[in-house]
Amino acid sequence: MGAVLGVFSLASWVPCLCSGASCLLCSCCPISKNSTVTRLIYAFILFLGTIVSCIMMTEGIQTQLKKIPGFCEGGFQIKMVDTKAEKDCDVLVGFKAVYRINFAVAIFFFAFFLLMLKVKTSKDPRAAVHNGFWFFKIAAIIGIMIGSFYIPGGSFTEVWFVAGMLGASFFIIIQLVLLVDMAHSWNELWVNRMEEGNPRLWYAALLSFTSLFYILSIVFAALLYVFYTKPDDCTENKVFISLNLIFCVAVSIVSILPKVQEHQPRSGLLQSSIITLYTLYLTWSAMTNEPERSCNPSLMSIITHLTSPTVSPANSTTLAPAYAPPSQSGHFMNLDDIWGLIIFVFCLIYSSFRTSSNSQVNKLTLSGSDSVILGDTTNGANDEEDGQPRRAVDNEKEGVQYSYSFFHLMLCCASLYIMMTITSWYSPDAKFQKVSSKWLAVWFKMGSSWLCLLLYLWTLVAPLVLTGRDFS
């Protein structure tokens, strides 16, 4: 009897698979809005794609993929550096799988980007497709994934690698904008609370976190100088670290200039400290992609040097061993790639909960003027009977709270960023005989760090330059 009731209880949720997003989650968070829950579900779909991509790099999955006719032989035949020929297929099956998984996810979100252009309110019939029909969407993604494994190699992987570089570059720009927006919003929130009451507490909190981020930045920069430079070598690394340190000091000074404070009172050192730390991360990430291993020590050698008291500074040249061949299970992510995914997940969650009222960077992903927060009071959220799937309030009848099309474009580019991150930005050579790090990835990431600083600097000086525009 209990099993029968369980089946009927499960069946009551089936309509949710073909209806709105809020129906799927609102039993655990009844006071929510449709715009927020929909973004969370799309973000969760992308997160699942990321997990599947990571799983595809494991040995067991690769063994099964090798059984697919033509997947390992023919097409994109390349060899990993310092890897024996009999292990080539084990490594590249994982790389091919990551390309195809994220191809399916990117195509799915790009199709929705085109479909959702010019959607203004939830009354648009296309809004129902955006906010519902989850069974068919998931089935479509799975179908595209399965079909992508039968796409011939060769030119497909070559073209998709270029597409991945372009898409990942655009997502890094979006990620940088979200980071700047988060820093501004955090500072504004705490400054407001400091003005409302108990100023000493919030001032101490602001000072503590600002000091912490700057201390971490100083330690980070010192470690980069110690392990990624040499007295008579690694000139590029010295220039990269020094330039970005100078730029970070410059934007920190600009953020507290009287003129900037006059036009933008909420600007301060908290934002600058976050941007400084992130810029140094991008600098480190760029240097880990350098093909010259003498200036790019492995993580294990650095840890050994830090933990072993027997290693002297005179032996610091041992920190740059030859490139370690990947295991039989294939190449997996480096530490900087893992940190890149962590930052990606954070930005993805932030973009899902992000409110339009606290956006400081031109409301990049939002178009409405109302706040989209889970804690808002809603009417009719509990109208459903107990035990039935609760539905969230449709807060977009008068206007969408974010750009549907841009949100899908962001997720499309995010899937390409995941693809490049998991494969460590490896680039095939002209004859497709090996795959290795390239200076292109180094300059790409360094350019991203400079773009981050430029974006933040623009948010500081924009009110001074565009005096006729309201930045409040």
Swiss-Prot record:
The keyword Transmembrane applies. This is Serine incorporator 3. The chain crosses the membrane at residues 97-117, 133-153, 159-179, 207-227, 239-259, 330-350, 406-426, 446-466. Residues 118-132, 180-206, 260-329, 427-445 are cytoplasmic. GO terms for cellular component: Golgi apparatus; Golgi membrane; plasma membrane. Highly expressed in the neuronal populations such as Purkinje cells in the cerebellum, brainstem and spinal motor neurons, locus coeruleus and raphe nuclei. Highly expressed also in thymus, kidney liver and testis. N-glycosylated. It comes from Mus musculus (Mouse). GO terms for biological process: antiviral innate immune response; plasma membrane phospholipid scrambling; positive regulation of endoplasmic reticulum stress-induced intrinsic apoptotic signaling pathway. InterPro entries: TDE1/TMS. Restriction factor required to restrict infectivity of gammaretroviruses: acts by inhibiting an early step of viral infection. Impairs the penetration of the viral particle into the cytoplasm. Non-ATP-dependent, non-specific lipid transporter for phosphatidylserine, phosphatidylcholine, and phosphatidylethanolamine. Functions as a scramblase that flips lipids in both directions across the membrane. Phospholipid scrambling results in gammaretroviral surface exposure of phosphatidylserine and loss of membrane asymmetry, which leads to loss of infectivity. Glycans are attached at residue 34. It is a multi-pass membrane protein. The keyword Ligase does not apply. The modification Phosphoserine is found at residue 371. It catalyses: a 1,2-diacyl-sn-glycero-3-phospho-L-serine(in) = a 1,2-diacyl-sn-glycero-3-phospho-L-serine(out); a 1,2-diacyl-sn-glycero-3-phosphocholine(in) = a 1,2-diacyl-sn-glycero-3-phosphocholine(out); a 1,2-diacyl-sn-glycero-3-phosphoethanolamine(in) = a 1,2-diacyl-sn-glycero-3-phosphoethanolamine(out). It comes from the Eukaryota.
